[in-house]
Amino acid sequence: MLMTEPKYIDVDGVLTRYFDAGKGPPLVLFHGGNLGSGNLAECAVDWELNFLGLSKNFRVLAVDKLGQGYTENPLSDDKYTMSGTVEHAYGFLRALKLERPNIVGH
């Protein structure tokens, strides 16, 4: 297995899937992809080759972005924007009470 079992958290009313493993400084991984893409290749599992290796030194979290993978779609169409995606990402960090996380994206 290259990832842990998925977890889900409510982020401002949007059910959000993520993976969480390891101990240490938080390292949050955000995948690439287009807003609202139905392609499951654009999800947190993009990080599967790096995830467990990184968890040896960090608490590593990989999250499905807003409207991608198994994270729900935005609550309104006006959130299908980059700012809506960033708001959701920040909401994810707040919901998990992550202070000063390291962030990686592609």
What are the residue ranges of the model-derived segments?
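Alpha-helix initiation/capping motif
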Residues: K7, L40-C43, D78, M82
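A general secondary-structure boundary signal
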Residues: P6-Y8, D20-P25, R94
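Conserved beta-strand scaffold positions in the cores of enzyme catalytic domains, especially
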Residues: Y8, V60-A62, H106
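N-terminal cap/lid segment of alpha/beta-hydrolase-fold proteins
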Residues: M1-L15
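Active-site loop/oxyanion-hole signature of alpha/beta-hydrolase fold enzymes
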Residues: E48-L52, A62-V104
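A generic structural signal for alpha->beta connector loops
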Residues: E5, N57-F58, R100
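Conserved HGGG/HGGXW glycine-rich cap/lid loop of the alpha/beta-hydrolase fold
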Residues: V14-E72
